[in-house]
């Protein structure tokens, strides 16, 4: 069996041996070169192997590409490391950082048109190289690699967003109608299947969707077609176990759980985010102030932690910096209030000041960092939940106490009600009530065409009055009951998240 014909690739004063057959198989550049019969491309030294001269490439990049070619384009085990240990090592005197090495590898692979290597890079996109790969894909016109990087950055959006290099790529759009890279990624996070998710200390039991194997899950997802709940497997951080009074909000399709207190200890400032794209929890920067029984609101791509137990200050979390900063405080400390975002501003309603009932609606403008008195109410409300659609705020549950001359009599001040407040017309509407259910200790989420409302605590001893699992349809102004409560449990939270489609996972 004859020895395989080798070719020497010369770059400056160094030569690299490579199989001629594999070179032609893997490199479109050399395949075209040999087929063309170009004399200047076929220089052979007397008595030695054929020599091909290359210019303008880097030695480390070329060596990695040729090692890949010599391996026959083998994909198994080929990983790009800081020094290219897989797919060919780099001499110690050529030690380089991964970004530089990656740049030179893509340059050489693109010049030599080694398509199989460029395709392999699609599976090598990582958090530490996705931004550089995206830049290189733009420079060398590699649409498949660019798309792979975009998909990866969508999945790991906040982790990518806080990297300094991101803002070099994410420059503002140059023409009207153009969308920035940041906006493209943010919009792509809102794709997939909208799913109702419940988080809590589930106990299983007769109300559980089915018997659990081992420990009950900490998160469940709701399947609307069958009206059943299923475990959403994830590793809940130990720091979140038995935490009460925390703030929660959805930002860029991440579920944030922030602050709170532990039954056996004091308040905490820790913050975590759940990424449904990876089904993983991440710890993010902690607040500057430990706080509990406060409101966490997402507005204009940031989070605002508002007030708390005997606390009036407000902090803003910017995921681009992974940092919290104090902003304008509440005019007064508030307790048992609620807050939500509406048309880019924050509205605070109800609760108590240190002296009396809070009858004011407060509005916070993030751009001016200023709180203003928006309106004064005739109805006092506390412990309510709030969500918004366009310019309308929906107030769910709570304990109502009417003070005006048109006070209406009701069977109970804490029955389950839904009211709306239009921030443009400043009109209140009393929409719906359920006199058999309590409006206290609830969690709710806006999901599809309605507001899903659940009790925070349900056990065998919980009365029917305090077992709530209802949907308020905002278009038909009607209640819709559900047959299945997720499970017995405490400290429950319901949210709406986009989960990846099965074909994407």
Swiss-Prot record:
Gene from which this protein is expressed: KLHL42
Function noted in UniProt: Substrate-specific adapter of a BCR (BTB-CUL3-RBX1) E3 ubiquitin-protein ligase complex required for mitotic progression and cytokinesis. The BCR(KLHL42) E3 ubiquitin ligase complex mediates the ubiquitination and subsequent degradation of KATNA1. Involved in microtubule dynamics throughout mitosis.
Subunit structure: Component of the BCR(KLHL42) E3 ubiquitin ligase complex, at least composed of CUL3 and KLHL42. Interacts (via the BTB domain) with CUL3. Interacts (via the kelch domains) with KATNA1.
SUPFAM superfamilies in UniProt: Kelch motif, POZ domain
Entry-annotated residues carrying Phosphoserine: 43
The protein's name in its UniProt record: Kelch-like protein 42
Domain called BTB: residue spans: 5-78
One GO cellular component term noted in the UniProt record for this chain: cytosol
Cell location: Cytoplasm; Cytoplasm, Cytoskeleton, Spindle
Superkingdom, taxonomy of origin: Eukaryota
